Amino acid sequence: MSKVVKFGGSSLASAEQFKKVGNIIRADKERKYVVPSAPGKRFSDDTKVTDMLYACYDLADQGKSFKAELDAIKARYQEIIDGLQLELDLSEEFKIIEKNFKAKSGNNYAASRGEYLNGIIMANYLGYDFIDAATVIFFDENGEFDAAKTNEVLRARLAESKEAVVPGFYGSMPDGTVKTFSRGGSDITGSIVAKAAKADVYENWTDVSGFLIADPRIIDHPEAIETITYRELRELAYMGATVLHEDAIFPVRQEGIPINIRNTNAPEDNGTWIVGSTCQKSKYVITGIAGKKGFCSVNIEKDMMNSEIGFGRKVLQAFEENGISFEHVPSGIDTMTVFVHQDEFMHKEQKVVAGIHRLANPDMIDIESDLALIAVVGRGMKSTRGTAGRIFSALAHKNINVKMIDQGSSELNIIIGVANDDFETAIKAIYDIFVITRL
């Protein structure tokens, strides 16, 4: 049995945190492959190393001196090395980084050095092999992740190492230049390594004890979810819930590898299990609540819309022509509403409206701005009557007007539209009725 373990930036921010990570890895001999992030914040006003690297490279790109900034980054890593009492010298690595910064090697290269250097320290600390992600994780000429090549090369390389560290966040282009995943991409690297290693479990260690039912910035001390399916997690991640990068779900989902989200600062907690399917009933009717602000709705009306073949396609074509993706499209007999990101839409709204008139000839178009979408997700909703009614009741009790409700055919989620100003109150009301009072 083997486990791939990924540790986030907060778990590796200092030597003290490194020691916790070392104890966790050594406590289970099945934790054979480690994916580290760059050092995060040591305290609330601290700066993440990735952000320090971005700022440092920005000066280099402008042809300005970046010595002080690079020295500060060196000091962060040296503090960790000294705290772990390692005989490790990164000076040659920093000479290469300085040279490449002066050669304007790009933001992707700059950002990736945080994980790269942390990986070297981690491998030295654990006595594991170090595998530079640029040699085993690949992107194609269009900058898209090359899953087939990566899996083949990485699987062969891991077979040569019983225990290894693979830095997160980056890989390489066909010409050898470094390319990063989107922010939070170390989660993706961990998933890719788990797939290539044919791991039994992918452990994702962070600073929370699992995936929470709701955003702790809105709900005080929300409960952790014990078990959640990939489909549920995908719905919640898409609607803004954070802990695991949404693209990290797919590689392990394909292989049926479960993910266990754990807390570095509380390793005794079981965390959250993310699985393909389960016979376990969720503790509550809902599994989680998530949402985003900043949407607007484009409401289109036309008599006899339901009998006009291709009407919806024509409307959506107007959005496509302007490079705007939609979030949800609830509809009635003579009405159709398209929800889009407001910041994406506002600069092109008149072009889109003109396009809808040209393509679909509607009777009326009305635009409403400053809306929020909330997803209530749970496999338990399918077998429970009255879930939507309870949501309406909770929101009505708080005098919140529901702008839209849309339930997927799978009955896995219900999407509610409310005003931006009602967003936090709405989430509190929904959490209260399903988790606290359970009315």
Regions found by a protein language model. Give the residues of each.
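Nucleotide/pyrophosphate-binding catalytic subdomain
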Residues: M1-L244, I249, G417-A419, R438
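Structural motif
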Residues: S2-K3, R31-V34, Y128-D129, K162-V165, ...
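Short, ordered loop/turn segments at secondary-structure junctions
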Residues: S37-G40, A133-V136, F169-Y170, T206-G210, ...
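A conserved regulatory-domain signal marking ACT and ACT-like small-molecule sensing domains
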Residues: N270-L439
